[in-house]
Structures are given as structure tokens and as C-alpha cells.
Amino acid sequence: MSKEEVRLFIGPQHPGVTGNMSVEVLLRGDTITWARTHIGYLHRGFEKLMERKIFIKSFPLVCRICVPEPDTNEENFARGLEELAGIEIPERAKWIRTLVLELSRLQMFIMWYGGIAGSMGLSTPVQWGIGDRDYILDLFEELTGGRIYHIYIMPGGVRKDLPEGFEERVLKVMDMVERRLPEYDEIIMENAVVQKRLKGLAKIPKEWVDEMGLTGPVARACGFPYDVRKDHPYEAYPHLDFDVITEDGCDAWSMLLVRRREIDLSIDLIRQIIEKMPRGEFLAPLPNVLYWKIPPGETYVKSESTRGEYGFYVVTDGSDKPRRVHVNGPSFVHGITLLERLLVGQNIADVAPIMVSLQTCPPEMER
Amino acid sequence: MEVLNRLREKFEITGDKVQRDDLALVETTGKDLIPVLVYLKTYEGFKTLVMISCVDWMEKGKFQLSYNLWNPEKKKNIIVKIFLDRENPVFQTIYKIWPQAEVYEREIHEMFGVNFEGNPTQDEELILEDWEEIPPMRRDFNTLRYSMEKFGEREPKSGIIIRKQISEQYDEWRRK
Amino acid sequence: MGKDKKYFLDEKPEKLTYGGVFRRINDWARARSLWVVAYGTGCGSIELRPTFTSRFDAERLGMRMVATPRQADVLIISGYLTVKTLKRVIRVYEQMQSPKYVVALGACPINGGMYYDSYNAINRLDLYLPVDVWITGCMPRPEAILAGFKRLQELIDSGRADGWKKYIDNLDRYRENQKKIIKNWKMPNYNW
């Protein structure tokens, strides 16, 4: 640190950071010359706690790993246990899970769409985004009983079947969201400030994508069609008809475009799911879950969350508790390795838009 | 997967298993791990490091390190694992092959106490602050006892007494 | 920032004394403009967003988020607190100007909630900070948060929300408890 440089601490108590984390930067004038991410403010030791709980008791814990999008965790963990225990789940359960996953992706994207505008000082879309997300949370509440934490997906399928008339209500909300989107576009996409600030911001070199293991919208904004739903189809995704969205700008604007198109894709997928969903059982018969022992083995299951590839590495040793569960969220790489390199050379005012563009989610970095 | 045959020819592979169509598990020795990783990255297209994980096998006296790689073209995952001695867990860093390995190794160093030689930042605190006990993810660290000792009882004594009274009353009511 | 700069209180600050009709007017006014410091310490902050935006709209009750603790009246402990965050929270709390109020959200600050056995999450918040209102649930719904704030307003209005006075009076005891789990009182150089 030379005399011309100033050390600045962004977070943890700062409205601009995405959650409870902090970034330490060195500034020369307005330009960042060095950055370091500090995490650990939300570390609860999930992986340790799960080692001392039987499998079914881990489910209330596992959904709390990523707060805004809990269903990915449940689905991943359930799928990992099913694979190790050799349980086949009914066809309808797969479709219901896919519906829940897509709904949770959609609500996260809508909140994010408002959030990226909020990070640049546009507060109207924030209000809209969080307000419209609540319609989807109401659907979740009807389906699972909880607004944020659902604990709905469990090994063998899902906890309950869809309530009567739920499909129509989902479609109604989808119509509502679709009707609202042009207003969002008008206020965000066509805004000169947003365009000027995001175009060319945080340009990611293309070779970083494979080298660092970037996934999700960040990789897709660089032109790499990496989507776990297509590459390693899980649940009901093989039966759905969709294309992977890519953009070629490698910057924050392309990430915005990718996520904007993902909203359309999610709405389309939800309609497809409701149209094609089969009837039947929703829960496979399980052994007594209180004495459920899973044979030794290890596996890595992954799914596509809004931020990228979300993976669970599960190791069992034949007892009734997992030997090791390692949760690998996409933010771990995006928020530490990528962010530290990406911030260098940027303007101090652009830290918040870059962090929101990468969608760093601290609770999944440190678990 | 065919890559397993080629690996078996070239390196000392002590065990392998095809878990799924797109996931293979390979076990090798510490000496061969870095050649295997470099071979997989350069010749087999496993360009991406997904994660590094550590498992504590306390009964066997071993730490297991798992390196999870992904092939973006063929869409396959492979997990290469090695076993380290639990008493003196030292291994080489691989952050020169993949930059994100640095943070994964830093986390494993903090949580399990595995030393990665050559990692420039592993001694910096990542998640914990002023930690004085043995690394918390080791199996012999008792988190419940630590929590009770450090953070005290979950509720005040009066609360425990009241709860006890309530449950006694409830038992009585059930007996009736 | 010198090395021996004091980051935390080390002696009792002067207590604000006022009484009679001024106290009544002050309390009435304070209850109607609660500014909340925007610090999401845990997962509860996800439900604070709906509370403070268009659907539940806490601003109509005079509450809004502010960025700096020096302008804020209320500190929301949203969910579990890890040891690392507790140190920052204490610092944020001591920076706030009296009168100040603490609202604890969720089951975790009450008795540890589902992290009762975690090595990094505290069990009982009231050992370390004075809490005025507890809101239970995991997560508390926005309606519950609003009800909790309503309760806080009643307490302030009737002059019973005096957690900050307790903190000043019992600073030694609180500090003793805090020192049990925070060994190093120096802020690391990456945040202070």
C-alpha cells in the first residue's frame, strides 16, 4: 500500500453489499487497485451440524443454507440421498419438484431484477420487484405452508400433493407477472443510466470461465452454453423443451440480459410443466426414516440455481447419519476468486452493481 | 467411462467406480495426484475444477481429499481422491493449476487443519475468527459440548424449572 | 486510524436525563419515527425486504432503513448471530445514539433455535445486548414483524423501552459476558 492509496472497507454493515459480507479495497483516486473478500459473518457450521443429525432431521437445516432460494438445497440433498439409497421416485413427484424449483428461480430472478436497479439508485423497481415476488411467495405458502423456508421436497418425492386448483392459480400469477414485465423493461432496460453504467462494466475475459469454473448466468453471459438443466438433466427437465440462453458481451449488461431472458424462460417452463404434468403418486414408500441407514458411498449431485451450478457432495458410511456433506454454491467462486480479480481497475461506485450482477450470496459461501 | 481405462494404464489407480453415467470416482495415491489432475486437464478435457472437499475418516486415521473436475464438452464429472495421514496432513497446493483452488484449500486448512504447502494465503482467516480449539470440522471436535461451554445454557434456570413443571403437569394430566 | 484507537465503550457514558412533559413529548415523537439501521445480520433480513417495501409498507408507520448507525434508532438482530457478527453488532450498537432499541427477530436469538449446537452461533442474545422486543418464528412473517414494531412503539410511547438505560447501568456485566466469547477486542484491519 503506497501513500497515494486509501484503504476502504465496504461492509459488513453497508447497504450496498449483498448480504452480510465485506469487501476490502485499496483505492487510488476512484479506482480500485486491490480487493479482498471477507466472509464468515454467517457461518453456522451446517456441514458439522448435519454430521450429527439423522438424514431426515437435516432437511430443516439444509434449506437454510441459501436463504432467498432454499428449494435447490432440498432438492439436491434429497436427490443425493435417493441416489445413494437406491430409491426411485414417482414420475409426478419429479414434475412437482421441477415446478417448485422453477417457481423459486422465478421469484429470485424477479427480486434480482429489481435489485440490480436498486444498486444503481433506482428505487422504484426494487419496490416492484419485491412486491411482485410476494405473489409467488403466496403460492408457496399455499403449497407448503411457509413463505421462505418450505421443507417441501423430501427423500422419495414431495411432502404433499398439489392443492386443488393450484395449477390455475399458478397460471394466473404467471399471466400477471408477464403483464408486468414490459413495465420493468421500460424503467430498467431503456433507462439511459442503466445502459451507460452496465455496458462494458466488469468485463470478464473468456478464458476465465473454464479456468475458474464460472457457471450459470455469468458463464452464459460470456457465450458459454453451460446450463445444468441441459447438460446433466435432472428431475423432469429432460421432458421440457427449452434452449440455453447465451449472450456474448461478457459484461454486466449481458448478465442483465441473460437474467431478463431467464425470467421469460422460467414462465414458459412453468406453463409447460403444468401442461404436461402426469397424475399419480407423489411420494415413494420409504423405510422408517427415524432408523434409516444408507449404505456407504459417495456422490456429487448438482442443479441449476439462479446463480449457477449448485452442488452437493454427499458421503455416507453405512450409519444413520451422513459422514460428510459439502455444499458447493456458485457464489464461492464468483464471490471470492472472481470478484477479487474483477474489481481491480473498476470505479468504487461500481462495486454494488458488480456484486449484484455476480449475485453473490454470502450464506452459501460460508455455510 | 473410457477415460478410466486410460488412467489405469498410465497411473497408479487404487480404486475406481462409475457412480452415474456422468460421474466417475477414482482413487489414487498422493504421489500421482498432480500428474493425474494435469493429465485430465490437458489431454482429457476436464478443464474445470468444481470443488475440493475433505472427509475425515477418524477411525481409519485418514483424511480424504476429493478433487472434483468437470468436462465442459462431454459433460462429465470425475472425482479424484487421495488419502492423507491424519496425524500429519500435508499436501501440495494446486492453485497454480486452477486459481480458485487457493480459496478451497484455505477453507480446508481452516476447517480440517490440512496443510497445503506453497499456498500463499492459507494462514489467513477465512471464516472463523480467533479460533483456539482444534479445527471444527474434525470428527473429534464436539460441537454441542463446545456450544454449551462457550455460549451457556439455552435458557435461564427459571425457564428450565417452569418447563419441567409444565411437562410434569402434562404427564399428570395424561395419566388421568 | 491509530492502533490503540478505542473501538468500544470502556466507561459508562453520561445518561441522558429529562423528565416531565418534555419526556412525554419526546417519547410520543420518537415512537412515530423509528429509523432502522440497514444491517442484515442473518437470514431474517429476507423478510425485512417485503416489510419495508410496497406490499407491507412499514414506511407508513414512520419506519425506514438508514445506512449509518449514527442516524438510527432501532437495531434489528435478524436471526442467528455468529461470533464474528456479534462483535460488529456490539460495535454498531455502541455507535448508535441513545435512546436506542433492539428488536430480536426469530427463534435463534432467543435460545439458539436450530443452531443450538453450532460452534459459531450464540445461544442467547440477551446476555450480550439488551433486547426490547422479541419476535418469534422462523422466519417471522412480515405481519409478525409489523406487530412487533407496533409493540415497540407502545413501549416507547409509554416510556418503558429502556433497554439502552439497562445497558449503561449494567455495562460491566454485559461486557463480562461479551468478553467470555470474544477474546480479541481489536477490530481486524479489514473492518473497524
Give the location of each predicted region.
Chain B
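Terminal low-complexity/charged segments
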Residues: 1-176
